């Protein structure tokens, strides 16, 4: 049920643990900013059985913000892949290729407001972060928090439903061609900026509903 808490990359004590479920792989290497994007023996995952692959690295080997990918070998070929359970992916502004990103800020976000109270009859404002701004650009979590949330509260809504939050490479898909089911779309900002948006909404008495897409993917 909580596979996202096991697979992907996680900081466990003084170590980093990388895990993937890839039953058809013959070998998997982790490569990224921390090893010059090279396929090297020290970054080869261990086959733990049952399709589970794992690599444990010391905490000093990886830092917050590092980009990385898997390099997977299988019978008849090999290639780069993003972790199935990546929680943060970013797009290169030049090549437009996505990489996973280690996301572990030194300080966790500190919530300021309690959750908005449950209401029997929610009045829902449906919105898309990127298209909610008035400027001819993709709006961000910060833009939405500053400019849109106050308007939603003033109009009397008690719930906001946010569309297209999962990472998707094609912006024109409106978020319905999901590539990374466990990652917020980085084009809108950071996870902490999204938490600040939710926090501010709760402070205004507005509940937040995340429109999570399970039935569409890029494959």
Task: Show the residue positions of the predicted features.
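The feature marks proteins involved in alpha-glucan
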Residues: 1-17, 22, 38-39, 44-126, ...
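Residue-level signal for pocket-adjacent positions within structured domains
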Residues: 2, 29, 40, 77-80, ...
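Short beta-strand elements bearing conserved aromatic residues within extracellular beta-rich modules
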Residues: 28-30, 68
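Predominantly extracellular/luminal cell-surface or secreted proteins
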Residues: 31-33, 73
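Substrate-binding/active-site clefts of carbohydrate-active enzymes
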Residues: 90, 108, 112-119, 124, ...
């Amino acid at each position: 049920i909580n596979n996202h808490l096991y697979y992907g990359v996680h900081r466990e004590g003084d170590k980093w643990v990388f895990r993937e479920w890839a039953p058809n792989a013959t070998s998997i290497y982790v490569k990224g900013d921390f090893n010059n994007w090279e396929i090297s023996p020290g970054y080869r995952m261990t086959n733990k059985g049952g399709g589970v692959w794992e690599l444990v690295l010391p905490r000093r080997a990886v830092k917050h913000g590092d980009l990385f990918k898997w390099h997977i070998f299988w019978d008849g070929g090999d290639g780069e892949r993003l972790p199935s359970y990546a929680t943060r992916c970013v797009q290169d502004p030049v090549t437009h290729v996505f990489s996973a990103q280690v996301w572990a800020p030194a300080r966790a976000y500190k919530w300021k407001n309690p959750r908005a109270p449950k209401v029997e009859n929610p009045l829902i404002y449906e919105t898309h972060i990127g298209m909610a701004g008035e400027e001819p650009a993709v709006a961000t979590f910060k833009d939405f928090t500053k400019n849109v949330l106050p308007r939603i509260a003033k109009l009397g809504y008690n719930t906001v439903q946010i569309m297209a939050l999962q990472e998707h490479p094609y912006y024109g898909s409106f978020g319905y061609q999901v590539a990374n089911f466990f990652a917020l779309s980085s084009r809108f900002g950071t996870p902490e900026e999204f938490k600040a948006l939710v926090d501010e909404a709760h402070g205004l008495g507005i509940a937040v509903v995340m429109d999570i897409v399970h039935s569409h993917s890029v494959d």
